[in-house]
């Protein structure tokens, strides 16, 4: 998931599993991307007979949209794993940097992708944990996102993925005048609500409109001397710019969306890695979603009663992911849909 369209870990793992003759597996992934079309063959062969994920895209989504899958939000997935409702037998975790004992991170190495927020929960609760890396370093690796105490074995491969493809597709900056107009209206609503003040907290998505809203808010905050407490969620270069320019005290990062954000989490101690439990587990002792003042939600469909679809197109074909949308919409003081 963290390498998104650049991921090469899942295809390599599934090829080995299929070659061993293993069948009837449930794939419990935090999310699936366009480059995971190889799963179609493994489903047809019976290697994979069940999928739990927040979403998927591309040919894989089209192929199985008429089948039965169980979509889960990021917070809901963490909750089900921690409460033992979903037991993970083996977690294969891609790490851009790892030592021989399994201490690992995602912010160093040639395939650096940033936060390992989703994998942290898997590492804590899976029966067996396999670290997969293309950058084996002398002991101890530093920093440590997932420690050796959670890891059963380390596998070195030629390449875990292409970090240049992390931001492809779902993350984009828009120049579309309609989308910019929507973003302008959305920022005016947030400001008029009286929530943009010193100490406020914020989450923006990775879509074009959401990122444009953040840029409009940045201009307003700088013009009025406003500094928020934190921004959270999937972190993009837009959010790291706001951190560097004094708009927020900190960033809480469960997933890093582009190269600039990877550099930020590596170099700036104010850019903090968090796991999916801390982010949005509804039954955790405390989660970040419930501390949000404002969250921006992109959608594929919205009806006149404000019911929101973020997973499928109007024809029922899966084209996105639940992500943390329902989690943060439930927790934030203001949930704003832009579409």
Ranges and model annotations:
Residues 1-339:
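Conserved alpha/beta enzyme-core scaffold
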């Amino acid at each position: 998931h963290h390498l998104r369209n650049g991921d090469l870990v899942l295809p390599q793992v599934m090829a080995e599993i299929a070659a061993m003759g293993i069948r009837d597996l449930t794939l419990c992934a935090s999310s699936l991307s366009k480059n995971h079309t190889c799963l179609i063959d493994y489903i047809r062969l019976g290697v994979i007979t069940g999928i739990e994920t927040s979403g998927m895209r591309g040919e894989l989504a089209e192929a199985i949209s008429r089948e039965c899958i169980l979509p889960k939000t990021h917070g809901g997935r963490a909750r089900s794993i921690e409460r033992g409702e979903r037991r993970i037998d083996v977690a294969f975790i891609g790490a851009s940097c790892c030592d021989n004992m399994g201490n690992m991170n995602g912010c160093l190495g040639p395939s650096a992708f940033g936060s390992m927020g989703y994998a942290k929960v898997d590492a804590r609760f899976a029966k067996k944990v396999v670290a997969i890396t293309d950058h084996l370093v002398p002991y101890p690796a530093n920093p440590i996102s997932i420690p050796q105490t959670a890891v059963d074995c380390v596998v070195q491969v030629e390449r875990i993925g292409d970090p240049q493809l992390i931001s492809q597709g779902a993350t984009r900056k828009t120049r579309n005048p309609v989308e910019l107009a929507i973003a302008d209206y959305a920022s005016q609503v947030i400001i008029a609500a009286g929530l943009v003040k010193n100490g406020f907290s914020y989450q923006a998505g990775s879509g074009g409109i959401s990122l444009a809203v953040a840029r409009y808010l940045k201009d307003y905050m700088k013009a009025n001397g406003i500094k928020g407490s934190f921004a959270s969620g999937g972190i993009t270069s837009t959010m790291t710019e706001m951190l560097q320019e004094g708009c927020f005290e900190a960033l809480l990062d469960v997933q890093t969306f582009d190269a600039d954000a990877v550099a930020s989490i590596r170099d700036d101690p104010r850019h903090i890695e968090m796991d999916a439990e801390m982010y949005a587990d509804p039954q955790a002792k405390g989660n970040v979603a419930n501390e949000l003042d404002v969250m921006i939600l992109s959608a594929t469909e919205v009806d006149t009663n404000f019911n929101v679809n973020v997973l499928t197109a109007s024809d029922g074909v899966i084209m996105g992911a639940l992500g943390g949308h329902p989690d943060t919409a439930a927790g934030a003081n203001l949930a704003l849909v832009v579409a």
